[in-house]
């Protein structure tokens, strides 16, 4: 049957039939619940915020326990993702909870690439899940799903506006993860400032095109409460695991000299709203949105890069072998193109090197001829000086000989005069 025939058959009016007795498929919801409880659930939270903003404290407060923590330094060279997985149980429900902390986020002087490590981590989890899906022998039932289901983005309570880092980071993350912005340490600013700050944050998010997670309103069971809670975003929260006595009750709160801030008092902060929306009402929707929206977007992009694509209903679908052959031809063509480019680059490099060598040879030849000419000139000067010196030596020798001759003659003349005088006396 062709694809168009199947589509035409599926669009035909379906008939409703009455059952003459009990069949038993009304137990399907119970079967699904039983299977899910047996298998357990996983939930992965990414906490993005500056060091010391209260991420660990809020996680402890949300799940009413104490997770192991590690003191983080303000002098990290870069952003480091630190995942921790815990096994939790409430009644007969098992939850594998993973909390991923962004150590060193926003602590560097140059914050341009602070978001990159976070984006890479999310993509890595998507890629790991995709590789598991593409295996011939898949084991998704036992596979630990590490994809991030929600990003709690902690905003510093400045009371003015969002930092540039926050806007850039959330813009890079909104297509990859469900973002719930929260104002941390909300007890550090007044209620009037907090109200204005919330309005300013939402205005900046909308004007910059940042898509945060909206609590779903298509389910009648939760549509009303989710619609109301969407208007309270971002949640202003306070976290604390310490118990303070207020009246006759012990409540989780923060004790100050001027009073007590109760964590679960909705007139003090939005912690209860966050817990209701994150855990008690929309946890499954966050898991579903991660799979059907964010992961599907990543999966589609990756498969398109690999050469897979959807076909029109009227066209014959490509088989895996056809897709492989098309991709192989494309790869070989690209490889040949690269080889030709490299060959041409090598030829150009050789020509350039030969030209440089010839130029260098010419320069050396000119320098050699210049040195040779200088040598000849210097040799000529030395030869001229040698001849002049020889002439001077010859002239000196001649004068010396003449001088010696004169001296000899003078000596002989002087020695003959006394002899003559003696002869004259004798005569």
Swiss-Prot record:
The keyword Lipid biosynthesis does not apply. One of its GO terms (biological process) is protein localization. Disulfide bonds: none annotated. GO terms for cellular component: cell division site; microtubule cytoskeleton; septin complex; septin ring. GO terms for molecular function: GTP binding; GTPase activity; molecular adaptor activity. InterPro entries: G_SEPTIN_dom (IPR030379), P-loop_NTPase (IPR027417), Septin (IPR016491). Residues 320-407 form a coiled coil. Residues 49-56 are annotated as: G1 motif. PROSITE patterns: G_SEPTIN. Keywords: Coiled coil, GTP-binding, Nucleotide-binding. Residues 101-104 are annotated as: G3 motif. This is Septin-8-B. It comes from Xenopus laevis (African clawed frog).
């Amino acid at each position: 049957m062709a694809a168009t025939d199947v589509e035409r058959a599926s669009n035909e009016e379906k008939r409703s039939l009455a059952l003459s007795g009990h069949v038993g498929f009304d137990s399907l919801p119970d079967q699904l619940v039983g299977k899910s409880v047996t298998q357990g659930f996983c939930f992965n939270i990414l906490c993005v915020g500056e060091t010391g903003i209260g991420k660990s404290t809020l996680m402890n407060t949300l799940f009413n326990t104490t997770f192991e923590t590690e003191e983080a330094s303000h002098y990290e060279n870069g952003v480091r993702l630190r995942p921790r997985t815990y096994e939790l149980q409430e009644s007969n429900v098992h939850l594998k909870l993973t909390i991923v902390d962004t150590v060193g986020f926003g602590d560097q002087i140059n914050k341009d690439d602070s978001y990159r490590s976070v984006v890479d981590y999310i993509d890595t989890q998507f890629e790991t899940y995709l590789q598991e899906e593409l295996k011939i022998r898949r084991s998704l039932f036992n596979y630990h799903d590490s994809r991030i289901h929600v990003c709690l983005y902690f905003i510093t309570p400045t009371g003015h506006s969002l930092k540039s880092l926050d806007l850039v980071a959330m813009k890079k993350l909104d297509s990859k993860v469900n973002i719930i912005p929260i104002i941390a340490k909300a007890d550090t600013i007044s209620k009037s400032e907090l109200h204005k700050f919330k309005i300013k944050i939402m205005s900046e998010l909308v004007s910059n095109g940042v898509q945060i997670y909206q609590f779903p309103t298509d389910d009648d069971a939760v549509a009303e409460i989710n619609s109301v809670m969407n208007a309270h975003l971002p949640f202003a929260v306070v976290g604390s695991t310490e118990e303070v006595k207020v009246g006759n009750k012990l409540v989780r709160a923060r004790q100050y000299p001027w009073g007590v801030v109760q964590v679960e008092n909705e007139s003090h902060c939005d912690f209860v709203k966050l817990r209701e929306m994150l855990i008690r009402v929309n946890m499954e929707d966050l898991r579903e949105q991660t799979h059907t929206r964010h992961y599907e977007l990543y999966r589609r992009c990756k498969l398109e890069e690999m050469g897979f694509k959807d076909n029109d209903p009227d066209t014959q679908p490509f088989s895996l072998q056809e897709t492989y052959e098309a991709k192989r031809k494309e790869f070989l063509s690209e490889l040949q193109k690269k080889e030709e480019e490299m060959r041409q680059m090598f030829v150009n490099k050789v020509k350039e090197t030969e030209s440089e060598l010839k130029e260098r040879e010419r320069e050396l030849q000119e320098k050699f001829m210049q040195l040779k000419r200088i040598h000849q000139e210097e040799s000529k000067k030395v030869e001229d000086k040698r001849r002049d010196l020889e002439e001077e030596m010859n002239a000196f020798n001649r004068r010396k000989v003449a001088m010696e001759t004169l001296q000899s003659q003078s000596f002989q003349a002087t020695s003959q005069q006394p002899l003559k005088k003696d002869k004259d006396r004798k005569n």
